[in-house]
Amino acid sequence: MNSISNQTIPHQASRYQAAFSRLKAEGRGAFVPFVTLGDPSPELSLKIIDTLVQNGADALELGFPFSDPLADGPVIQGANLRALAAGTTPTACFELLAKIRAKYPELPIGLLLYANLVFANGIDAFYAKAQQAGVDSVLIADVPVEEAAPFIQAAKAHGIAPIFIAPPNADSDTLAKVSQSGEGYTYLLSRAGVTGADTKAGTPVEEILAKLQEFNAPPPLLGFGIAEPAQVSAAIKAGAAGAISGSAVVKIIETHQQDEVKLLAALGEFTRTMKAAT
């Protein structure tokens, strides 16, 4: 293990850097959808991801199904349960990730998951598998930056960008730590609480964005409650590098899970509309 951590493996944050540079040159922001791998089934999950990318997603944020998601609202919990019912294991998730990476060599791919999944087979082993599958970044939702040292170490040993959440109620100390420890991008919460499609992303974020800039944080993407194009434009106007939409995307999967044609058409339409707002 030591030999690995002593080598300098190039950071996967470079795919994010390339994407953000390209968007900056175009004068646009990023639209990043979130879905749970394997929802509603591993096969359809791949088609869903193809649809998101082909209709303008600038990066992907992907979850591993987990049966006790503390920070997730009912929509994402539903996605977890559907994926688990379809037999989506962590091994199946890594296989899906490798396929996605092979198809889209330049696309930034991030994981958003819970510490239990990372602990299951050892922290280092998880990051090694993530690196092998072509993952660029890992955000562990229930590990604050203050407790993240072992995860950061494993991430860096395997050339993966550790991502941190900047909560809306964070003090300067926390924002400084998030800025120093994070790579790739910063996940900026538009409000505290659980994820959901209904609540407006109404927290004034300009102040946090100014602080993150002052601390030279990786580009901030605004997440939580992003369900409409107007919220994407507002996030970018406020100074975010883009927006992440999870529950709104998963809601479409939930609604049309029995009808593949309608499902992919609705996801394509949603992605195009959200991307157009960047």
Curated annotation (Swiss-Prot):
Pathway: Amino-acid biosynthesis; L-tryptophan biosynthesis; L-tryptophan from chorismate: step 5/5. GO terms for molecular function: tryptophan synthase activity. It catalyses: (1S,2R)-1-C-(indol-3-yl)glycerol 3-phosphate + L-serine = D-glyceraldehyde 3-phosphate + L-tryptophan + H2O. The active site is at residues 61, 72. GO terms for cellular component: cytosol. Its EC number is 4.2.1.20. SUPFAM superfamilies: Ribulose-phoshate binding barrel. Keywords: Amino-acid biosynthesis, Aromatic amino acid biosynthesis, Lyase, Tryptophan biosynthesis. Disulfide bonds: none annotated. GO terms for biological process: L-tryptophan biosynthetic process. It is an enzyme of class 4 (lyase). HAMAP family: Trp_synth_alpha (MF_00131). The alpha subunit is responsible for the aldol cleavage of indoleglycerol phosphate to indole and glyceraldehyde 3-phosphate. Tetramer of two alpha and two beta chains. Belongs to the TrpA family. This is Tryptophan synthase alpha chain.
